[in-house]
Amino acid sequence: MKNKRLIGIIAALAVLVAGSLIYSSMNKPEAKNEKKVAKVGVLQFVSHPSLDLIYKGIQDGLAEEGYKDDQVKIDFMNSEGDQSKVATMSKQLVANGNDLVVGIATPAAQGLASATKDLPVIMAAITDPIGANLVKDLKKPGGNITGVSDHNPAQQQVELIKALTPNVKTIGALYSSSEDNSKTQVEEFKAYAEKAGLTVETFAVPSTNEIASTVNVMTSKVDAIWVPIDNTIASAFSTVVSSNQSAKKPIYPSATAMVEAGGVASVVVDQHDLGVATGKMIAQVLKGAKPADTPVNVFSTGKSVINKKLAQELGITIPESVLKEAGQVIE
């Protein structure tokens, strides 16, 4: 009798446990329906408006591809232009378990490339990926690296300089000696400028500390100043402008933010659009695309940005044809 009662109790308990398990499984979200949160490591070389716009564009591009806040975790770091931090942060981002890593600007991409040969590396705003030894071929990168390149439209810039300031004969190119992409841009700009009958004198600075003194020397030797896509110069562009205050030489930079901050004009690649394209490429790789087979997306044509207010202050007459074709006019 006791055994029958015990068996009954055990059976009842078994039913309760089974029912509980069934209820629990019915109310638990199916694992297969749970979306994996992508992990993306991002290293930005330095803070300045152009690179900040690229980072914003990356986030927007990811969102457009379905990777919104709840579907992607961004592990963001900024080396603030410190090369030693680039190496340390690159290793940290690789070790953090990210699905891939992104380098905004050439030094950041180079740091990440040195830190891993296996994890996908996506370049953002790399002017010369081949010259920077990041990829061997733009159409078929062949390794763990691909991305988006902001090739400087040097020929268009030379044409704009001649259209706005036809009396300019000698241009000073101000750039950082530590950035490989800047050297490549200067060589290309110089070649186009010389074909157009202009003389280009180059002025390289090792860091932001030498910008003021270098600009002071430049202004006594040149008719205008040209600045490539250069993170060192961009991060201290206000120093370039203030050091040129008395000489009032027209400055032709290579980014919209710098035209707004004291440049006369430029032909630029839209940095936000570049970031969006980078974000979409990140999404492709997250979905299974191989960097080795994913061509580098090259932005090679730009739009002109004119600082009309500053041009008038410098006595520069802007042809109507230039104004009509401008992508942006700052009044």
Where do the PLM segments sit?
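Structural motif
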Residues: 73-95, 204-218
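Extracytoplasmic "Venus flytrap"
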Residues: 37-59, 65, 75-84, 178, ...
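Hydrophobic alpha-helical segments within soluble ligand-binding/sensing domains
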Residues: 129-168, 270-289
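Beta-alpha junction/loop-to-helix N-cap segments that form part of ligand/metal-binding clefts
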Residues: 79-135, 230-245
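Flexible loop/hinge segments that line or gate small-molecule binding clefts
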Residues: 111, 118-154, 251-265
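An alpha-beta-alpha
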Residues: 58, 146-193, 295-310
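Flexible loop/turn connectors
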Residues: 257-309
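Short, low-complexity disordered leader/linker segments with a strong preference
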Residues: 1-38
